[in-house]
Amino acid sequence: MLFKSLSKLATAAAFFAGVATADDVPAIEVVGNKFFYSNNGSQFYIRGVAYQADTANETSGSTVNDPLANYESCSRDIPYLKKLNTNVIRVYAINTTLDHSECMKALNDADIYVIADLAAPATSINRDDPTWTVDLFNSYKTVVDTFANYTNVLGFFAGNEVTNNYTNTDASAFVKAAIRDVRQYISDKNYRKIPVGYSSNDDEDTRVKMTDYFACGDDDVKADFYGINMYEWCGKSDFKTSGYADRTAEFKNLSIPVFFSEYGCNEVTPRLFTEVEALYGSNMTDVWSGGIVYMYFEETNKYGLVSIDGNDVKTLDDFNNYSSEINKISPTSANTKSYSATTSDVACPATGKYWSAATELPPTPNGGLCSCMNAANSCVVSDDVDSDDYETLFNWICNEVDCSGISANGTAGKYGAYSFCTPKEQLSFVMNLYYEKSGGSKSDCSFSGSATLQTATTQASCSSALKEIGSMGTNSASGSVDLGSGTESSTASSNASGSSSKSNSGSSGSSSSSSSSSASSSSSSKKNAATNVKANLAQVVFTSIISLSIAAGVGFALV
């Protein structure tokens, strides 16, 4: 009886948490290449400030890099943000174990929206070994769940500067898959339609191709918006000399909103922010939707607008200069009633020297499918094997059997059906491949004591998917695979459908992601399977720690 009562209370609480009140700011929606207020259809320009310090708050001696979880600090800073005419803050990492309600309400009451990065330093797509895994997807979903019911959440970034030059463009396929899956998750959970986008660096070799890549394809795969961290205008420059004219011409045909996800070059100090007049002026507002100044807090990189000493705030010259510029803008405004959205589609970039990401995207991570596969194995890794030893085992086994079933290659657009599983599940899969290839005797499942035999089982809900995928894990499972028990229904596929730290003039060290190239041949996929495990291991450890901290009722520090 008590359980039923608690369940009803929990259901009611969840319902009311998702209901917007009269005091909530209107949600921001995307129409064509612009943002609009949902209540009256007037255009929304981002007047943003990056708002996250390396040591945003401290709890029990642990540094928690989450400014939205410290009401004392955010309530202190909101009046200063309002002096800067701020209507958006960007937050780079979220600690989902902490409470954000007080700060989010205070920001709402000040008419300030939030764009939150889904990644964090320990849970992001690694540009050197890109993967899109169950653990990473679960981490992103937790951030969505934490903030979805706040109407002043403008959107989410699924990555920040993951691809940062032409050598690691393949990583963008994994970020685009994250955008696709997070957006679908938002829909599946019946949350309001919250935009999901990407924040890029301004690399001359890749910027146009990368923008086209994230803007191309069907609505279910392309980004809802695109940010570029722009540091071209330094000191007393102008629209043409700075490069702004060229960038505006390059992005004029985008059918999604584009804005500066960071800006504010500090090669000349104090910063004058004369670019503000140009950004919100007639030369740029047809294409650009504003920008986010980097950054609020003064740190060693000297990008701060204010310095903080305890609870005292001191405004710097940059603060005064930016305030003077941002408070005199008056951009032209469109309205959804008269606005005609851009309908022209952007072509996905062809692969070549400066672009190597395939339009075929990684499959949607499905933990239930991984559980099905693991239960169907006869030979599995022993529980007492240290995860630090996995790489050695992968290297040896993948020289003996084809590990394509657990590999992911963003260049070739080839992804094993189990490429999103945990390293332990993947290791068991390839151990079982070796065991069966070698004859299936007990000695074939030894691996110097690292493996053990189990009774293989296949649940009825698993059999069809496992049969279609095949013993090597390289085929696709058609249709929706409902594997129940805490997993989402998704299409298990080895080829998912779809179209696809700066110096003084750069961005924050809290940038969320870094990643790399996978090879396409069978021999390369063996090597890739071994190297991809390193990124996955970090995610497994991080997720386990978070789970333990939640169970113990303690906060977890994102550092």
From Swiss-Prot:
Q: Which GO terms describe its cellular component?
A: cellular bud scar; COPII-coated ER to Golgi transport vesicle; extracellular region; fungal-type cell wall; membrane raft; mitochondrion; nuclear periphery; plasma membrane
EC numbers for this chain: 2.4.1.-
What are the catalytic residues? 161, 262
Species of origin reads Saccharomyces cerevisiae (strain ATCC 204508 / S288c) (Baker's yeast)
Residues bearing covalent lipid (GPI-anchor amidated asparagine)? 528
What name does UniProt use for this protein?
A: 1,3-beta-glucanosyltransferase GAS1
Query: What result is annotated for mutating residue 262 to Q?
Result: Loss of function
Q: What else is known?
A: Present with 11000 wall-bound molecules/cell in log phase YPD medium.
Please give, as recorded in its UniProt entry, the membrane topology of this protein.
Answer: Lipid-anchor; GPI-anchor
What SUPFAM superfamilies does this protein's entry cite? (Trans)glycosidases
Q: Which GO terms describe its molecular function?
A: 1,3-beta-glucanosyltransferase activity
Q: Where does (1,3-beta-D-glucosyl)n 1 bind?
A: 92, 119-127, 160, 294
Summarizing the annotation, the consequence of altering residue 103 to S is:
Partially impairs the folding and stability of the protein
User: Can you tell me which residues bind (1,3-beta-D-glucosyl)n 2?
Assistant: 161, 202, 207
Tell me where the signal peptide lies: 1-22
EC category: transferase
Q: Which InterPro entries match?
A: Glucanosyltransferase, Glycoside_hydrolase_SF, X8
The function of this protein is: Splits internally a 1,3-beta-glucan molecule and transfers the newly generated reducing end (the donor) to the non-reducing end of another 1,3-beta-glucan molecule (the acceptor) forming a 1,3-beta linkage, resulting in the elongation of 1,3-beta-glucan chains in the cell wall. Involved in cell wall biosynthesis and morphogenesis.
Entry's family note:
Belongs to the glycosyl hydrolase 72 family.
Where do the record's region annotations for Disordered lie? 474-526
Which PANTHER family does this one have? 1,3-BETA-GLUCANOSYLTRANSFERASE GAS1
